[in-house]
Amino acid sequence: MRALVVYCHPDPASFTAAIRDLVLARLEDAGAETRLHDLYADEFAPGLSRAEWQGYLNSPENRAPVAQAADDLDWCDTLIFVYPTWWYGLPALLKGWLDRVLLPDLAFLMPDRMNRTIRPGLTHITRLGVFTTCGASRWLTLFVGAPGKRTLLRGVRLLCAKRCRTAFAAHYLMDSSTPASRNAHLVRVGRAMDRLTGARPQTRQAPA
């Protein structure tokens, strides 16, 4: 198993960091080779530049500005996102990562004479995990449409293998969370990771 974990949070001491640590621990337990992209620590620039836009369709030259991320996306068979939900969607850095890294001839194939729509390019990815926290309630998030979750588990998922296995866990109402609720969520994340990797259930958890 080759796992790429894309992590996005500005605070190294956040609860989201604890979720990341648990995800990494479960991958280690499953014997996975793992690469971590910490978007804040890496000072990832989310804005698609004019030059990138003008060269967007020029493959493989379009990979040059994000070469490491593109190589890691091409390398992995397991893709996991760990992030906070802000305004019901993805943080700007993570959305920018999708904009700049999910490129033509890498993440998808553009329409051509034989195909009227795009085709999946990430068919080597057979596992997709999404782990997030939300300030809003589950009901309100669903009422708005859960755009962040939909972007990843529907939009990105469509680019992956047809039988791509998925996992999702969200801690809602984070602003009123308690040690008990956070610990319970870590248990859910651990179980979701075990299902995603096919590993036997573990007792290992990251501290809250």
Feature locations, PLM:
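N-terminal beta1-alpha1-beta2 submodule of the flavodoxin-like/Rossmannoid cofactor-binding fold
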Residues: 1-106, 187-208
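A structural motif corresponding to the C-terminal end of an alpha-helix
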Residues: 76, 82, 123-124, 156-164
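Glycine-rich phosphate/pyrophosphate-binding loop and the adjoining helix
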Residues: 140-143, 147-208
